Each structure stands twice: as C-alpha cells, then as structure tokens.
Swiss-Prot record:
Disulfide bonds: none annotated. This is DNA polymerase. InterPro entries: DNA-dir_DNA_pol_B_mt/vir (IPR004868), DNA/RNA_pol_sf (IPR043502). It is an enzyme of class 2 (transferase). GO terms for biological process: DNA replication; viral DNA genome replication. It catalyses: DNA(n) + a 2'-deoxyribonucleoside 5'-triphosphate = DNA(n+1) + diphosphate. SUPFAM superfamilies: DNA/RNA polymerases. Keywords: DNA replication, DNA-binding, DNA-directed DNA polymerase, Nucleotidyltransferase, Transferase, Viral DNA replication.
Length: 717
C-alpha cells in the first residue's frame, strides 16, 4: 500500500455514491461578523456586527463573560440560518466551547464532533432514540478548522464559519487587499490582553533582586542591574477599556464587510458561497452546481487497485547543502491540468488481465497493475513510490523483487527508460475509451483562462477565488474523514469500523467512554480513487519524463509536487528551456533562478539576483530577494533566512513559535482545560541530517552543508 494505510474495504463509501447536492447560495442570507477578545483564555467581550447594523459588544464591564452572555450572542435570532463569520474561528471556537461546556461535554465533542450543551453546563447524553432537545439545550457540532454549528430546541440552526482560510493572510492585509481600507488599532497591542512572558512585558521596573508578578503568582529572579519589563493584563484592559471595545467592534465590522465582498465576487463567478466550510467545500459546491452527475468509481476491483496505487505528490531531495546556481521550472496548475483530461471511469470499458504483456498494457488507455519488480539501483531518480514501513514514510527506492501497485503509465515509462531489470505482472486492470466515454472536467481550461484573464486585468479577487476552486478540486477526490461513535452493548462492527479500547484513551475521554469507542473512515462526496491516483501519478510522471528526456538525472537537486530544481548550467545547456511557456494550463514555466541552499524536502533557500517584486535596485527587503521554504515550519520564524540560521546553529536550528492551545490537544495530552486559549511557546529543531528518504553520508553538519554539496543514492527495499 502506498500513501493511505486503509484499504478501500476499510472506508465507508456511501457518500461517494450520492448525487451532487443542491447548491447553497449566499444571496439571501444575512452576513454577520463576530470576534472574541480574551485574556489568559477567558472571554471578556464578544463583538458582533449584524448585517445592516452598527457593531456592538457583549461584555461584563471588564470581567469574564457569563455562559448566558455567550449563548445570547451565539444564538441571537439574527444569527439563525445566517453566515456568521469569524477570522480564525479555531481560536474563537475553542475559547467559546471551553467557556460554555463541561469536561464531559468537551470530551464527547473531541471524540464524536457533537455534544449536548446547556446554559448550566450539566451533562445529558443525546441518545439516537431521544433526539428531542429540551428548552435551554443546544446540540453543538464542531469540526476543527471548518465550522461550529448550534441547534436549539426549536430546531433553529446557528452556523459559524472561518473567513480567514479563504484569504491566506492576516485580517489587516485582507482588509487592505479586498476593501482598500486599513485596520487601525489606535496603538493597542492585542498581545497585552493576555499574560506575557518576562521578555514580552511592557512596563519597566526598577532594579531589584526579585520581581513577583501577582497576576500569575509567578516569581521571576532578576540579577542586580538588569531591567525587566512586566505587564498586568487586567490593568492594561482596565486602562484601555474604551479603546479595546472600539477595537473589537472594528474587527467584527471588517470581517462582515470582508465576507460580503467575497460573496459578491464569488457568486458573480457562479461559485456558491452559502456554506463556506472550507476551501475544499467551495470547490465541491462549484462541482455540485456545475455537474449534473458525478464520475462513478468504476468496477470495485479496479477501484481497489487504483486506491492501492495512490501515492500523492512527490517530495524528494537528491542533493543537499550549498548546491550552487539552480533553475526551478514548474507546471502551471498541474493537478487541474491532468483532471481536465481524465474521463469518468464508469464510462470506460474495463477488463482484468492477470498476466498482461507489456504491449497489451501499453496499448490500453488507462490502467493499474500489481507487479513484482526490481530496478537498476545505480539510477539516481527511481520511478516507483513505496511505503517504507520502518520509517512509516513514502520513499522512492530501488525496489528489489518488491510487490507494488502502480498506475500503468508509470510502469511503462520505467520499463521503456531502462529502469526495470526484472518484473512479474501479478494482476492488472486495463481501461479503454469508447464512444460513450465522457470527460466531465473538460470545463477546467476555460476556468483557468478566466482566472488568468482576471489576474492580467488587475481583478485579483476574482483570480483568487477561481484559483481556490481550481486547486481544491483534487483534494476532494481523495478526501476521507474519521468518524467515531460510542460503543453500545449490541454493537456489531461493520467492515470499515475498528474498536478503540478505553485503556488507550486519556483520562477525560476514558471517563466518558468507559468501554472505548468505534472509529471509522468515511469517504467524501467526490471521493474517486481512479481520479486521485491518476492526477498525482501523471504529475509525478511528467516531472520524471522531462528529467529523462533532457538527460538531467544527475543534475536534479529536488522534486516537489509540480516543480523540479535543477543545476542551472546543465539546465541551460539542455533543450528543457524550449518547453517553457509563460502561461497555459499544464505547460512548463520558470518559477525561479538563483543560488540554492537545501536541507530537505521543502526546506531550502533561494537567493535571487534581483528583487522579485519589481522594486528599485536598492530594495533591501529580505523576502523580495530570497525565497525561503520551511515545510512543516513557519517561514516567519526564520526572518533572516535559512542560511543565516544555519550559520548560527549549534548542532541544529532552533525555531520558537507561539500558538494557542486547543481543547483537543489539551484533552488528548491529559492537561488542564484552564490552559485552552493560552499561548504556548514551542521549540522545534531543524537538523542537518533531517532527510531520511535517501542514503546520505553518515556524518554531516551545518558547517559542511554550508560549504559543500552532498549527493545521495536511493534506498533499497
């Protein structure tokens, strides 16, 4: 098995067989903006801007809000069946839920995604056999990073969404880009609403041996002559109360106006904006509205083989360290380009060919094969994705008599290019186009052209929403969602379900689920193994094909989804550059050229010769002349770049980050719920030997990598 550890039999496919849903438009829905202001995880005010009204604030005169006050805002009649938008709902939802729910309710919410809450925080189980809500009770559904939904005893629905995921930037930047306004804070520092660590505090204190900060009952020892800064959050809030209320109202109003503009732009483009759960759901809604019928899964044995062959995008580093001058060509909208040309698998003619010949496989239009294969271990870039069970990682090794399942196009390429030294076909499903074969996604080129036209004409908002739809379609074809339910006495497990015993659970969850619970994996509505495997498989294949075609295997530094990094001189001397087209769906384009320092997959720095933002020659902004990628880390944590951090590193690069703690992580790690919403300082490390997907020299350090380029060999499996 490649990318997914669950076989197709272990996935509930019911939703994949449903018809497209009716589009939900926003044109007749009220749009409201909301925001919380917190201190040490406690909510001291909620601001709300109802559509057509001036913003208001629910507060308790500088004190923590009561649960009743929170419920009043969340379930106001103006929030019913409305688009209630927040900016970074994850934070707000966590502090809100921790405010209004008991431990038992939160444990149930973390496990199942739903719980029954009420104004007095007492617990009553919501049974399948008794679904009637009582007055004062609310059925809560919360899916992290997606939405918070509340249902009351009158069956009124109040759904809250996260606007931030659609803008890819801060509220301040989004407001500037979309509304042409600035987000004025009147000198307020939101970070001061909560507790601060000593080096973040603001009021200078006199020299002393010891300072006691009574707000947290913490004592900090200070050496004589040092000056520390301290700050009492409660005091700061009290002194700046009127400004904070104004700040909160402005945020709520801006969020409302921001989403109103997004709705106006999106629905002009025929993108249904009425249920903005996520960027993926936006793409799903677009497909639901555009296509009358979903592509089918095709014959189930073929679909199982397709799922076995699915391996996602390719991230692999072949050279690391100071690799010198590089060129980085990439494919324009690679995944949408492949999807545009794929058929509905149920409209193909399929046949099983257990021991098919190479010629039979090659002449088929589509197909998947299980094969026992060996490849030439001296070749730098191997063609097949294999799960390394020891590392629990997807790697591209030199398989030796290894059984794999693969898209037939990838195997034929490897065979024709001389990679395959021995093979035995074990099973094969081959597909052929017929007169009735349909291509449901043939509208994608038009959508891509519309996006490019919008961007060229300065209509960046239209371009962004079209880009979201285009780039999010692929994810729907491989979407699976975990589901959990309580174990009942007479429960019989379905094939796609598994039992999670109580002894493996943390304390709060074990108290609620004393017998454990049942877990399953559910396919998304547009789940389709044929499409998922072919989209990613043909994209990986295109990278490899171009490298082989232009004899650049020994000069390739890195492969990353839809892009390759190649040593500049060999690249320029090849014919690859002739393939480059500035625009065009699925065509190659030049993303960058410059000096590269590479540590691992998605962790590198490119130094450009000139400013990439069109600034004057004296541009001194680091981000304009350098590209820093730190996959799995935040680029903001390396303001001066990866090279600078490596030069100062003592064995490893330390990256400190600060983020709010969530209910889920608190419960799963057996910590105190009082920590929810508090900001946790974390330290992560980037090590010089971070890449383990290939065979490297055993001893390396940053000093070596900064001065030399190291090469690698593929693993053997």
């Amino acid at each position: 098995m490649a990318k997914c550890d669950k076989s197709l039999e272990a996935i509930d496919l019911d939703r994949a067989y449903t018809a497209p849903r009716k589009a939900k438009w926003a044109e007749n829905k009220r749009i409201n903006g909301l925001d919380t202001e917190t201190s040490d995880g406690d909510i001291f005010c909620i601001s709300v801007c109802w559509e057509g009204e001036k913003p208001m604030v629910q507060h308790n005169d500088r004190e923590k809000l009561t649960s009743k006050q929170v419920w009043q805002v969340l379930t106001d009649h103006k929030a019913r069946s409305s688009l209630n938008m927040w900016y970074n709902l994850d934070f707000d939802a966590n502090v809100v839920l921790n405010h209004v729910c008991s431990e038992e309710q939160l444990a149930e919410l973390v496990v199942s995604g739903t719980t029954l809450a009420n104004s007095d925080r007492t617990y009553r189980q919501y049974m399948d056999t008794d679904k009637e809500l009582r007055k004062g009770e609310y059925l809560i559904t919360y899916i992290q990073s997606k939405f918070l939904e509340i249902k009351d005893h009158n069956s009124h629905i109040y759904t809250h969404y996260d606007a931030s995921q659609f803008f890819y930037t801060s509220l301040e930047n989004a407001v500037t880009e979309w509304l042409g306004e600035s987000k004025a804070n009147d000198g307020l520092e939101a970070g001061l609403f909560g507790s601060q660590t000593p080096n973040q505090l603001r009021e200078t204190v006199a020299e002393s041996d010891c300072v006691t900060w009574t707000n947290l009952s913490l004592t900090y020892n200070v050496s004589k002559g040092d000056k520390w800064t301290i700050h009492n959050a409660k005091s700061y809030i009290s002194k700046n109360w009127s400004d904070i209320l104004k700040y909160a109202q402005i945020d709520a109003e801006l969020v409302r106006d921001l989403w109103q503009e997004a709705v106006n732009v999106g629905e002009e483009l025929d993108i249904p904006m009425g249920r903005p759960f996520s960027t993926g759901y936006l793409a799903e809604s677009y497909l639901d509205n555009r296509l009358r019928e979903k592509p089918g899964l095709g014959p189930m044995p073929m679909a199982k083989m397709a799922w076995e062959s699915y391996a996602g995008g390719r991230f692999e580093v072949l050279k690391r360290g100071n690799v010198g001058r590089v060129a980085g060509p990439d494919i324009n909208s690679a995944y949408p380009a492949v999807l545009a040309e794929l058929p509905d698998p149920k409209t193909l003619r399929w046949k099983r060919a257990k021991h098919a010949s190479i010629s039979e496989i090659e002449t088929a239009d589509y197909g998947f094969m299980t094969v026992k294969v060996s490849t030439d271990p001296t070749r730098e870039i191997q063609p097949f994705a294999v799960k390394d069970e020891k590392q629990d990682k997807l790697v591209y090794p030199s398989p030796q008599n290894t059984e794999i399942t693969v898209v037939k196009d990838i195997f034929i390429h490897a065979y024709n290019q001389g990679y395959v030294t021995d093979y035995e076909v074990i099973d094969c499903w081959l597909g052929y186009k017929t007169e009735g074969t349909t291509f449901p996604f043939d509208f994608i080129p038009e959508l891509y052209d519309n996006r490019k036209t919008a961007e060229a004409n300065g209509l960046e908002k239209r371009g962004l929403l079209l880009k979201i739809v285009l780039n999010s379609m692929y994810g729907k074809t491989c979407q699976t969602t975990p589901k959990r339910r309580e174990l009942a006495e007479s429960t019989e497990l379905e094939l796609h379900e598994s039992y999670v015993p109580d002894m493996s659970l943390p304390k709060m969850i074990r108290e609620k689920y004393s017998e454990g619970f049942i877990e399953s994996l559910t396919a998304g509505a547009w789940f389709n193994p044929f499409l998922a495997s072919y989209i990613t498989g043909l994209t990986r294949l295109e990278l490899h094909k171009q490298i082989c075609k232009h004899d650049l295997e020994e000069n390739t530094v890195m492969l990353a989804t839809d892009c390759v990094m190649i040593e500049e001189k060999p690249f320029e001397e090849s014919n690859f550059v002739e393939n480059l087209v500035q625009d065009g769906l699925g065509y190659w384009d030049m993303e960058y050229k410059g000096d590269a320092f590479v540590l691992g997959a998605g962790v590198y720095q490119i130094d450009f010769d000139t400013c990439q933002k069109g600034c004057k020659d004296n541009c001194n902004k680091f981000s304009h002349k350098h590209k820093v990628k730190t996959r799995g880390f935040s680029e903001a944590d390396l303001e001066k770049g990866l090279v600078n951090a490596a030069e100062k590193a003592n064995g490893h690069i330390e990256i400190e980050s600060t983020r709010p703690q969530t209910i889920s992580e608190i419960i799963w790690s057996n910590e105190e719920l009082s920590q929810v919403g508090n900001f946790l300082e974390q330290e992560r490390k980037i090590k010089p030997e971070m890449d383990t997907k290939r065979k490297w020299s055993e001893n390396t350090d940053f000093k070596k990598l900064l001065s030399t380029c190291e090469t690698s060999l593929p693993l053997k499996i």
